[in-house]
Amino acid sequence: MSDYLDYLEKLAAAAGMTEINSFASLKEALKNRMAFFASMGCNVSDHALEYVMYYPASDDELEEIFLKRLNKMVLTKEEELKFKTAFMLFVGKEYHKLDWAMQLHYGCKRDNNTLMFEKLGPDTGYDCINNYAPSAQMADFLNALIVTDELPRTVIYSPVSYTHLRAHETRSNL
């Protein structure tokens, strides 16, 4: 749990903020960093997810969830999914504003080799394909961005689920 709190401190410093103490301030820090990366020529994002989730929540709920995590309390699975959904919707909308492409790699089973994880840390090449892919949630996530006309150019990678993706192709992203 402290890894995330440590990350928030580093993000705040990189964004020129004294602290990140709310979901709203997290979004401001992320906007700041995206603007920096855009100024350096970045135009693509890359997210590796177990699956693309969709559990919408109100702003008040999200602030409560964020504060719970800041206070080192354990989130329920539902709270975690609501937070991740809100996070991904937020960055997706920001990518749209910046005209970035959003890459979603889903179906990832992370850090499968305990020995190498302990030696090298997370995300160092010991991942594999997972077959858990709730396509209805991914469809709802994409639709939430489509209905507000904020879906960025999107590339979705999942070798086990390509047939689920065809319904979201449009002329603008072919």
Located regions from the model:
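Short, basic/hydrophobic alpha-helical segments
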Residues: 141-147
